Amino acid sequence: MRLSLFSALLVLGSLVSAGELRLATFEADVTPPLGSPLCFNFIKPAATVETPLTARGLILFSEEKPIVLCVADFVVIANGSHDAWKEALAAAAGTTPDRVAMHVIHNHDSPGYDISASAELEKQGLKDVMSLREAHNQAIADTADAVREALSRSAPVTHMGTGTGIVEKFASNRRIIGENGKLEMARMSSCRNEEIIAQPEGTIDPELNLISFWNGETPLAALTFYASHPQSYYGRGGITPDTVGLARNRRSGETGALHIHFDGAGGNVAAGKYNDGSPEARALLVKRIHAGMKEAWEHQITSELSDSEPGWKTIPTQLPWNSPYSVGELTSQLSNPDSDTKTRIRAARDLVYHRRWKEGGKIDIHCLQLGNARVLFFPGELFVEYQIAAKAMLPDDFVAVAAYGDGGPGYIGTEVSYGQGGYEVGRVSRTAPGVESVLNGVIENLLATE
């Protein structure tokens, strides 16, 4: 018989009262129906399901309230949608939303959800034009059910493992800066221009970081983190978790433990140098990311966690607003029936985030600590420089980074990048150059030792 939430939490309370760390994993199918808009309706809608999409994660139980880590195979979850996911998963796990890290892997052949923007579009008679509200609600409900069902099958965590693999010939920086300090070339997720392909990889983090949890010799779950856009090709109507999702699924089967992958600070990083957008290139990229996952697993170092208490810090943070358009211009774009649908969708997304910022809204940025391992959980499409800086702050410890949490801010560049120009710091970024000083302070505070 299925335990009620109250009964399950009572059982868990008796198990962790002596300081024992326990873990439960969960997974739900969140594949949208055929015909669903994909990538906020900026590409062809869903015509086939190549590989189902999942929301998967784990719950850590200790003497404190549970911690929930979840990542969904969506391109974005933003604003009110991000709040809705955190609230639902927190309620299901018997914890509070500030102890939930909700992320996406940013695969483009998937839905993007932002119920705040959808509400503004609905006022203009544009219901379900950006995403399907019912599919979104169903995905949340099914994932929350999976969390509740996981409560009765938690297992003790006796050991934790940390490992690092090097991913070869996958990532390259999207932004090629000229001698004048301005963007000279853009190298996105795929590229066939030989001159652009020939440019150096640029600033990337080649490390794939892994944290695993064990009950004796039995693996319970694996978390991996790698900084790059995951796209090989997209926009052909085939629903898929793309490169990292396919490699992740394969590793789950090989290890017997649920594999949960987070996209790191890959806002300005993609596979363009090594990807021509062909199916053959996708297969090769999957092979390379899989090799990095496997290497990290095989080279991990395990340590006992019998008396460990997971540390969890949260810093609510307001990021400085930026847009090339005034609020009046955005309002006109949204309300003008002669504007194309994509323009109206962009305007709705910009306006709801501006309103949130103006009202003083903040985004939770988290740090999970287990032994000498720390994981930082960030919003938006964070530039890789933040990840590199975070690791440099604690060079003797294990530091991993997950980005693509709340997608409200869009791209989050460095201070210098906004003056260089380019796609990532144009309309798709809702943050100002001062964001770097804000985030550097947050990182320092989260990584500071007690």
For each of these PLM feature ranges, what is it?
Residues 1-8:
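Bacterial N-terminal signal peptides that target proteins for export
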Residues 13-15:
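N-terminal signal peptide c-region/cleavage motif recognized by signal peptidases
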Residues 19-258, 264-266, 274-284, 297, ...:
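Conserved beta-alpha junction segments in alpha/beta enzyme cores
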Residues 269:
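Catalytic histidine-centered segment of alpha/beta-hydrolase-like enzymes
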Residues 289:
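Anionic-ligand-binding alpha/beta catalytic cores of soluble enzymes and soluble regulatory domains
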Residues 293:
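Glycan-recognition surfaces in beta-rich domains, encompassing non-catalytic CBMs
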